[in-house]
């Protein structure tokens, strides 16, 4: 097994789970959104768990859909390799007809760092991964930066930050879709505070870092994964040249 194998596996599994979810979405329809969300979560989780158990038998897995007992398994904390997956990021958007801002996340953490990851955006027909990291868009001098925020619960402080730095807010669905939007040039930054978990950001952060983007907590400290408490409540991902201004603005707001 080579390092490249992990990049390939992450990309393949995310894309395959995404295709399965597209088929399920088309077959089931949108008449019962809650049932569609539950079925999608479960089907993708089972697929990823079985695939990783077959392909990477000795590795641990942390999944959003794992039971509390599985999440608390102490073997994960001493493992050298842990896959961190979100089988369906953006269940709300997945169950809304016409929306494409949902994703599948597959990331690998090794000995303290994210080493591989992929974000499938099935309804948009693309997968971003560390196998072939996207080239970051060029800066737009003199143009107001755009900050991706939650479409359902945008943090109040991000609205204050946008006013302070002269930015526009762009509502987007899932965390994976928002970070992907930074990497593809739809926005220049994503700022969030108020509650997330490791599986919400591990894969897109792996891709962002491989692309050369900035990714940190909103106080500038590193994002850390495979912790005993998987809560990771805030995040900043941006084009590298914009990060100092955003971090300074956040510090000013929190004085």
Where are the regions a protein language model picked out?
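N-terminal subdomain of lithium-sensitive/metallo-dependent phosphomonoesterases centered on the IMPase/IPPase/PAP
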Residues: 1-88, 160, 255
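Residue-level structural signal for beta-strand termini and adjacent loop
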Residues: 67, 98, 120, 132-133, ...
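DPxDG-like acidic metal-binding loop motif
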Residues: 75-132
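Residue-level signal for inorganic ion chemistry
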Residues: 17, 21, 52, 91, ...
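Short secondary-structure boundary/capping segments
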Residues: 53, 73-76, 119, 137-140, ...
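An extended, acidic
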Residues: 141-255
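Short helix-loop capping/hinge motifs at secondary-structure junctions, enriched
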Residues: 113, 134-138, 241-245
